[in-house]
């Protein structure tokens, strides 16, 4: 599979045109979609028009950026003007946004070619992409298994080679966990590094947009294109954005890496434990100083998240009422009946469950006991990370406690589904950057991801460690046979 730089070289040397690259991607999608089902909407016409614009620039001698002419898939909770944005929900069936998200605007300005919108768990709530109202996405490594979630469509599209890069969103692990399950690179940036303007909100204090790629450099290039201050997002950080590729050095001498003790133990698949331990040994061989670090409140991340995220979701999802856009229940008796029936018929069971949990946690009698307490624990989790980063540069642990599970295996038991984000959730609560990269396979040939966690705005260190490991191992060159 080519990298962004290789495709860029082919474009500037006129070996291939952007139109040819786009046509190849669209053909591959047509060929593989009956098996993978990663896309909800294909934007072939717009993609070819964008590719032709890039070809015109090349023909007139205009210098093009590295992302110009590169096919990309976009998770379907990012607003794209004039193109359906469903969030995987029946309640937004037929919704066409009148405006563009900041990240997709930046990608269009960079010349990237959007080939389509990818499937997701409804409103990004889920860990398997089985909560989509539209279709089930398959894991390209084993079509009977889930790709992870909620950004399962984006992860599967990149793993299958339907597209080189993709965007996802991550509220509690929705980029990193599917990246682990599908054997690709996935990054959740520092909270506020990438604008959320035009991202349909799930939990606003946790949501963050990030890249999927087949290798670390492509992820770094994509982050560089979407990161940066945006006055349209009040939580956007006003910090300079470096060229992240300058930190890709295959040497870890002097780097201090901490293994989070609390991530090893009960609930961790022994094969995941074995493979990630081997990966950590490899980091040591590359010159890093590795030690064990305790984050005592790490295991409280899951219950804390399942109070805070549903509370924010119950407020954010109050806006879907059938009045202005999306689905409206037919023939309601009156206004109140229209509201209740639209929401009852439009939302799926997991979204309803989380709205109920959130409404309960925010109710007068329980606010202090649940929501306020969860916010206090969130602060303690942040403090554990702060203490850890006084001792080490980067923290490491498995991305997910297991490899990809069979479709339908966990749908009847929401709690077992929630546990698949055990390792990723604390990173969102603390607003830190976290990257998952492939580090091996289990005995069934399913990918395993290693999670690298950096301090606030230390994507540079995360990329450096990830790149050094990637260059010393063969995992990023392994692709599923479809």
Curated annotation (Swiss-Prot):
E.C. number(s) listed in UniProt: 6.3.5.7
Catalytic activity as recorded in UniProt: L-glutamyl-tRNA(Gln) + L-glutamine + ATP + H2O = L-glutaminyl-tRNA(Gln) + L-glutamate + ADP + phosphate + H(+)
Active site annotation, chain numbering: 75 (charge relay system), 150 (charge relay system), 174 (acyl-ester intermediate)
Any GO BP: translation
Pfam families in the record: Amidase
Keyword Protein biosynthesis: yes
A GO CC term assigned to this protein in UniProt: glutamyl-tRNA(Gln) amidotransferase complex
GO molecular function terms attached to this record: ATP binding; glutaminyl-tRNA synthase (glutamine-hydrolyzing) activity
Keywords associated with the record: ATP-binding, Ligase, Nucleotide-binding, Protein biosynthesis
Gene3D superfamilies: Amidase signature (AS) domain
Signal sequence interval, chain numbering: none
Keyword Nucleotide-binding (UniProt): yes
NCBIfam families named in the record: gatA
Subunit architecture: Heterotrimer of A, B and C subunits.
Function according to Swiss-Prot or TrEMBL: Allows the formation of correctly charged Gln-tRNA(Gln) through the transamidation of misacylated Glu-tRNA(Gln) in organisms which lack glutaminyl-tRNA synthetase. The reaction takes place in the presence of glutamine and ATP through an activated gamma-phospho-Glu-tRNA(Gln).
Family, similarity comment: Belongs to the amidase family. GatA subfamily.
The protein's name: Glutamyl-tRNA(Gln) amidotransferase subunit A
């Amino acid at each position: 599979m080519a990298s962004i730089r290789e495709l860029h070289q082919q474009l500037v040397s006129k070996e291939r045109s952007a139109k040819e690259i786009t046509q190849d991607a669209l053909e591959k999608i047509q060929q593989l979609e009956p098996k993978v089902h990663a896309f909800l909407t294909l934007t072939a016409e717009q993609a070819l028009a964008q590719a032709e614009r890039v070809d015109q620039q090349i023909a007139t001698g205009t210098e093009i950026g590295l992302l110009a002419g590169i096919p990309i898939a976009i998770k379907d909770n990012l607003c794209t003007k004039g193109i359906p944005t469903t969030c995987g929900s029946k309640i937004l069936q037929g919704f066409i946004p009148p405006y563009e998200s900041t990240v997709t605007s930046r990608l269009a300005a960079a010349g990237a070619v959007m080939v389509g919108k990818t499937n997701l768990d409804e409103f990004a709530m889920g860990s398997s992409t089985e909560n989509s109202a539209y279709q089930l996405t398959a894991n390209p490594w084993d079509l009977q298994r889930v790709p992870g979630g909620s950004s399962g469509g984006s992860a599967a599209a990149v793993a299958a080679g339907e597209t080189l890069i993709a965007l996802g969103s991550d509220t509690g692990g929705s980029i990193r966990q599917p990246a682990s399950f599908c054997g690709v690179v996935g990054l959740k940036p520092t909270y506020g590094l990438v604008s959320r303007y035009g991202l349909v909100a799930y939990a606003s204090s946790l949501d963050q947009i990030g890249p999927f790629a087949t290798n670390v450099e492509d992820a770094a290039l994509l982050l560089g294109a979407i990161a940066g201050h945006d006055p349209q997002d009040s939580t956007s950080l006003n910090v300079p954005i470096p060229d992240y590729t300058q930190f890709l050095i295959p040497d870890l001498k002097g780097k201090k890496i901490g293994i989070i003790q609390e991530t090893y133990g009960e609930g961790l698949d022994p094969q995941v434990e074995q493979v990630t331990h081997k990966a950590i040994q490899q980091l040591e061989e590359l010159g890093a100083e590795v030690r064990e670090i305790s984050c005592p409140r790490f295991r409280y991340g899951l219950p804390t998240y399942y109070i805070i995220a549903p509370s924010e979701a119950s407020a954010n999802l109050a806006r879907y009422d059938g009045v202005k856009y999306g689905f409206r229940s037919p023939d309601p008796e009156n206004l109140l009946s229209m509201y209740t029936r639209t929401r009852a018929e439009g939302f799926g069971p997991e979204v309803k469950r989380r709205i109920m949990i959130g409404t309960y946690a925010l109710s007068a009698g329980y606010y202090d006991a649940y929501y306020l307490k969860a916010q206090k624990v969130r602060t303690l989790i942040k403090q554990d990370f702060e203490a850890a980063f006084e001792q080490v540069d980067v923290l490491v642990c498995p991305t997910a406690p297991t490899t990809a599970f069979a479709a339908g295996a966990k749908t009847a038991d929401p709690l077992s589904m929630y546990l698949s984000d055990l390792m990723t959730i604390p990173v969102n609560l603390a607003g830190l950057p976290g990257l998952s990269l492939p580090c091996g396979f289990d005995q069934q040939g399913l990918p395993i991801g290693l999670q690298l966690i950096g301090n606030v705005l230390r994507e540079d260190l995360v990329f450096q460690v990830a790149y050094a490991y990637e260059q010393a191992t063969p995992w990023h060159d392994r692709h599923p046979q479809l």
